[in-house]
């Protein structure tokens, strides 16, 4: 092989490596932006839930005044979520809030007069819808993170990820308490 041919092969190989790195880099940038956009949707739903909680708590407080521990935990979880600055802190605070709401639902079941309260029923319907939205947005976020993290670990993209500092993103897992949440029935009198 002549030196011209060797030089041509080296240049060709260098172009392939640079092109591959550039494509991988752009893919990572796009995936990270998608993760950020999806996290914003999760934040929107968490804020929606956070906004519903005071009305729900006030409705329950009027009837179940002796349950101060539960109300305190809910207030703490709202404050933590409001003060969280990173996705990881927000995930932790959201999981604590889910656990606190589960405790509230158990308390509420002990007060049948709440079931007939129209405002309580409306708030519970809104909360149920919001919880479903959070679950959907959490799933979409986790799908994006999983795709990104998988790309980040695959060859040759892992080289680009390492060179340019693309870090692994955390999944937004459901809280451990959610695996064993009690079933609660808030059926309204006379039907549903």
Residue spans for each PLM region:
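A helix-centric hydrophobic-segment signal that preferentially recognizes long
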Residues: 2-192
């Amino acid at each position: 092989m002549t030196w011209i041919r060797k030089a041509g092969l080296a240049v060709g190989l260098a172009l392939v490596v640079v092109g591959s790195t550039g494509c991988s880099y752009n893919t990572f940038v796009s995936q990270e932006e998608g993760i950020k956009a999806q996290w914003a949707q999760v934040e929107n739903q968490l804020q929606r839930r956070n906004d519903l909680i005071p009305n729900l708590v006030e409705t329950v407080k009027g009837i179940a005044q002796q349950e101060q521990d539960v109300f305190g935990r809910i207030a703490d979880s709202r404050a933590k979520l409001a003060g969280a600055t990173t996705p990881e802190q927000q995930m932790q605070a959201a999981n604590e809030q889910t656990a606190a709401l589960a405790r509230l639902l158990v308390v509420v079941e002990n007060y049948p007069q709440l079931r007939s309260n129209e405002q309580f029923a409306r708030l519970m319907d809104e909360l149920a819808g919001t919880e479903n939205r959070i679950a959907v947005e959490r799933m979409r976020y986790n799908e994006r993170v999983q795709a990104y993290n998988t790309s980040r670990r695959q060859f040759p993209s892992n080289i680009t990820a390492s060179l340019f500092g693309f870090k692994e993103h955390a999944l937004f897992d459901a809280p451990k308490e959610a695996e064993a949440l009690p079933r609660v029935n808030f059926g309204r009198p006379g039907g549903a």
